[in-house]
Design a protein with these regions (language model features):
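Residues in the short beta-alpha loop(s) of Rossmann-like NAD(P)-binding domains
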Residues: 39-41, 92, 148
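A short acidic, glycine-rich active-site loop
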Residues: 55-70
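Gly/Ser-rich helix-loop-strand patches that form or flank binding pockets
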Residues: 104-152
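Aromatic/hydrophobic pocket-lining residues that form π-stacking "cages" and hydrophobic walls in ligand
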Residues: 22, 75, 99-100, 134
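Small/aliphatic-rich secondary-structure junction motif
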Residues: 3-55, 78, 86-87
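Short, well-ordered secondary-structure micro-motifs
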Residues: 18, 45-48, 99-101, 124-126
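Structural beta-alpha unit
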Residues: 77-112, 152
Length: 152
């Protein structure tokens, strides 16, 4: 039913709960997981080289990329432990557009599985601004995973 499943990872517990759900789906349908971490470049641009000099921006970008890689590595380990094929994707862009509209057609995604809210406290006040955007704008099915504890 689902061949290619996109799982956005931001390092939050909710994102990893979504990944656990996606792994189960991938095992059932023999799907491939596409694990994405989007480095929100719009936030980093507040520290642009023009405003603060190149060093601060460069250092912040390096930290963001290293953190992103750690998040993707953890996701790949979880998929690999379940013998599910996964592909890591690291993107420097807007998380909302990347997840909802940019990545799905590029990788023939037919399902997005994501957490209800992420690491940003302001976003968690509502459903999660990224999640709400993806649900509204994505042209593929979206499964939203709540933070309910999973016994597995």
């Amino acid at each position: 039913m689902y061949q290619n499943i996109l799982v956005p990872l931001d390092g939050s517990d909710n994102a990893y709960m979504a990944l656990k759900h996606a792994v189960k789906l991938a095992q059932t349908f023999k799907s491939k997981l596409f694990l994405v971490n989007v480095i929100d470049i719009t936030r980093l641009n507040a520290y642009s080289p023009a405003a603060y000099g190149g060093t601060l921006y460069t250092n912040l970008l390096k930290v963001a990329k290293d953190n992103s890689q750690d998040i993707l590595d953890r996701g790949q380990q979880m998929a690999s432990a379940a013998q599910v094929e996964s592909l890591p994707i690291q993107v420097n862009s807007s998380p909302k557009a990347s997840i909802a509209t940019d990545i799905p057609p590029k990788y023939a995604i037919d399902l997005i599985v994501m957490g209800k809210s992420g690491t940003n406290a302001v976003s968690r006040i509502l459903l999660g601004s990224t999640t709400a955007y993806v649900v509204q704008k994505a042209e593929v099915n979206v499964t939203v995973i709540n933070t309910i504890d999973d016994p597995d």
